[in-house]
């Protein structure tokens, strides 16, 4: 079989099997087009391309220096430097000439090199609720720490602080500690709107940019937001659930509450989306609510669920808007109930275990690790690199089941 190879460089080596192994030799004459007859167990051809020689020379030739900009604009090098760094003492005509030259030359500053040369240390704070091991918040911490590690050359230091969920005084106390530390940027998982506003108003006054995580409150005017669209997520969850439960008379909605209220704005918005879909498409189906206390014990939860299913034997489908679907899943396994399907949120370890064992049918993943990573990275790009960032960043709504859970990449960025 005739083989034709167009070589980028004149580096063709023939490998020929022999009794001692494989020997290599170069042909005496090297051409840009090499023709050879290749037979089975006879000759092998390898082509080398040295990466160092494939550098785009045009890009190197087009590297723009401050001197080039000054010559193009007809001003001094010092004037160009002041414009690039937005310093004063530049006349309006000179600034316009430089800006026009930058535009014509398509100048792109090397922000990374400038930031490294500046050699300044930056402290960011992450304020999140206290949580137990393997929770959704732990994945956010992991992602945030990963970004901190990857940006260590820029002297980024991430401090994580915790507040008691549904305890406004705890949120206020920790937020005051953060303000006293005078950080360069803050990431906030909000408490109630008004309590969080008291914190963010002070951040605005001090010129400290902040990012909202998990719950979007546009009235607070954050630099950016990361999280799911909670309403759409709840709407989607209802639609998926009713593909299975369309012929049922009732479903169970499990919530986590404190003093009669759900413990997060996100959980509340998901429920609104869920009920909106049910009202529009399945108004005849009864939604039974089971409220589990936030600080309850596992034994208390087991008793409450046993009582619920004794009183509602017709319930065969459950949904929860939190990461605690495993509480119902564990109960179903222990009570050997195989006629109930559960849908919940978050790919935390306990939920994943129940999903694999079959006590949970579906999970909606919201990429907590990714949220934590990108919150820190967004502060880095906005504060250190002086780049514009997207104000709203919704996470994908991803449906997981037993058949595809092993393909979910929890730490993928």
Annotate each language-model stretch with its function.
Residues 186-204, 288-350:
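Hydrophobic alpha-helical
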Residues 110-172:
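Amphipathic helical "hinge" segments at domain boundaries
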């Amino acid at each position: 079989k005739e083989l034709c190879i167009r070589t980028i460089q004149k580096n063709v080596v023939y490998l020929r099997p022999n009794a001692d192994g494989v020997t290599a030799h170069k042909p005496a004459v090297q051409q840009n087009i090499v023709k050879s007859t290749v037979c089975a167990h006879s000759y092998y051809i390898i082509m080398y391309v040295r990466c160092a020689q494939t550098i785009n020379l045009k890009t190197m030739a087009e590297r723009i220096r401050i001197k080039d900009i000054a010559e193009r604009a007809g001003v001094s090098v010092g004037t160009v430097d002041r414009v690039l760094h937005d310093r004063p003492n530049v006349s309006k005509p000179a600034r316009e000439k430089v800006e026009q030259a930058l535009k014509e030359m398509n100048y792109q500053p090397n922000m990374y090199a400038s930031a490294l040369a500046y050699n300044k240390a930056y402290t960011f704070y992450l304020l999140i609720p206290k949580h137990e091991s393997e929770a959704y918040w732990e994945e956010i911490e992991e992602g945030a720490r990963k970004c901190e590690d990857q940006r260590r050359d820029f002297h980024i230091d991430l401090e994580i602080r915790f507040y008691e969920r549904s305890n406004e005084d705890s949120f206020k106390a920790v937020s005051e500690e953060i303000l006293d530390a005078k950080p360069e940027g803050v990431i906030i998982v909000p408490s109630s709107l008004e309590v969080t506003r008291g914190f963010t108003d002070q951040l605005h006054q001090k010129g400290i940019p902040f990012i909202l995580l998990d719950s979007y409150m546009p009235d607070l005017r954050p630099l950016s937001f990361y999280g799911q669209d909670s309403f759409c997520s709840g709407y989607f969850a209802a639609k998926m659930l009713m593909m299975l439960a369309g012929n049922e008379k009732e479903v169970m909605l499990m919530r986590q509450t404190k003093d009669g209220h759900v413990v997060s704005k996100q959980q509340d918005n998901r429920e609104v989306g869920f009920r909106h879909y049910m009202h529009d498409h399945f108004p005849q189906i009864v939604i039974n609510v089971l409220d589990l206390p936030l600080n309850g014990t596992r034994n208390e939860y087991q008793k409450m669920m046993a009582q619920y299913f004794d009183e509602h034997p017709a319930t065969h489908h459950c949904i929860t808007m939190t990461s605690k679907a495993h509480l119902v899943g564990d109960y179903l396994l222990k009570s050997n109930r195989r006629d109930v399907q559960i849908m919940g949120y978050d790919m935390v370890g306990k939920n994943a275990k129940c999903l694999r064992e079959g006590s949970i049918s579906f999970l909606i993943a919201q990429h907590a690790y990714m949220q934590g990573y990108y919150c820190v990275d967004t502060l880095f790009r906005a504060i250190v690199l002086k780049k514009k960032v997207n104000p709203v960043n919704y996470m994908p709504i991803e449906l997981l089941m037993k058949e595809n859970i092993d393909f979910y990449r929890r730490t993928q960025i």
